[in-house]
Amino acid sequence: MTNAGIDLQLGFETALQNLGLGAGAAHALWMPLPMLLLIIAATLGVMVMTWLERKISAAAQQRIGPNMAGPQGVLIPIADGIKLLTKEDVLPILADPVLFTLGPILVFLPVFLCYLVVPFGQNLLISNIAIGVFFLIAISSVQPIGLLMSGYGSNNKYSLLGGLRAAAQSISYELPLALSVLAVVLMSNGLDTVGIVEQQSGLGILSWNVWRQPIGFVIFLISALAETERIPFDLPEAEEELVAGYQTEYSGMKFALFYLGSYANLLLASLIAAVLYLGGWSFVVPVETIAALAGIPLDNPFLQIGAAALGIVMTMVKAFIFIFLAILLRWTLPRVRIDQLLDLGWKFLLPVSFVNLLLTAALKLAFPTFFGG
């Protein structure tokens, strides 16, 4: 089922205007809602991910894991949140107060802004803009600035080294990640995230980009792991070398921003992978085929509501496959050295991503039916 997607902002403001409100008042009422929705959804997602992290790590190490705070330890994320909220927010004497405060904000904010253009389900996204993929890449590139500010503003040698490592790592892996995404954009003939999902919905699982972009898919996964600073790419906060890297001097809510931003970034990368390569909300079997077999017309409202609800579930299931893989890799792989990390990004992934992009362009010209000509 390929619909163009609904702009929630336009629908919300139009409904309020139909009730008699002016355009300015309707827009003013809309403005805080997306950020509120993002904060609530991301917080819930982070809570689930932190619980999964503890349980999967416990299973990998043959432990029980959290089991005291609620059944199976499901309330442990709430306990973590209360602990961070009640901790003192310390500002080191020799730290730069402006940079020290702005750093966590610039790390935290771009991640949440990127959620504005990620479609969570059929016709469910906050802003359906035509340059959604470009917006994702552009906004996410702001994050290294916050990492550098945090490291430099802390006036700590470990923080500075961690900030420099984080910026170098982020810049090194942004390029292959962007080139792998560009290959998908080339096949989809547009930067619209909804359009990319619709381009994969024709034949169900056979239409997913993962089959036409296996090299780009692997490059995206490796680069996304490096961008989210997960083991084996957690060089910026290597405990044995740098205490906690650029986070060393942080506590309380400022540290909570790093903590929340890290897991929200992993969830974002997983959602983008699901949208770009696994068909987003698309089912394994197309909805049209299911409706035809069941004898249900496509314009049936119950079918549309059910497909939309299941589409949200499909998107989250695909995203959590990547999250499970990232958590499992954290507890099974050793950390790479900084020279190995940079060599992998610049000497291997970047050239391969260039070749993959050129190969995609050639295949699109040779086989336009299969590669979006």
Curated annotation (Swiss-Prot):
Organism: Synechococcus sp. (strain JA-2-3B'a(2-13)) (Cyanobacteria bacterium Yellowstone B-Prime)
EC number: 7.1.1.-
Pfam families: NADHdh (PF00146)
InterPro entries tied to this protein: NADH_UbQ_OxRdtase_su1/FPO, NADH_UbQ_OxRdtase_su1_CS
Catalytic reaction equation(s): a plastoquinone + NADH + (n+1) H(+)(in) = a plastoquinol + NAD(+) + n H(+)(out); a plastoquinone + NADPH + (n+1) H(+)(in) = a plastoquinol + NADP(+) + n H(+)(out)
Location of this chain's protein in the cell: Cellular thylakoid membrane
Transmembrane segments: 29-49, 98-118, 129-149, 177-197, 202-222, 267-287, 309-329, 348-368
GO BP: aerobic respiration; photosynthesis, light reaction
Keyword Transport: no
Assembly, per entry: NDH-1 is composed of at least 11 different subunits.
Gene Ontology CC terms, in alphabetical order: plasma membrane-derived thylakoid membrane
GO molecular function: NADH dehydrogenase activity; oxidoreductase activity, acting on NAD(P)H, quinone or similar compound as acceptor; quinone binding
Bilayer topology term: Multi-pass membrane protein
Function: NDH-1 shuttles electrons from an unknown electron donor, via FMN and iron-sulfur (Fe-S) centers, to quinones in the respiratory and/or the photosynthetic chain. The immediate electron acceptor for the enzyme in this species is believed to be plastoquinone. Couples the redox reaction to proton translocation, and thus conserves the redox energy in a proton gradient.
Highest taxon in the source lineage: Bacteria
Family label: Belongs to the complex I subunit 1 family.
Keywords carried by this UniProt record: Membrane, NAD, NADP, Plastoquinone, Quinone, Thylakoid, Translocase, Transmembrane, Transmembrane helix
Enzyme class: translocase
Protein name per Swiss-Prot or TrEMBL: NAD(P)H-quinone oxidoreductase subunit 1
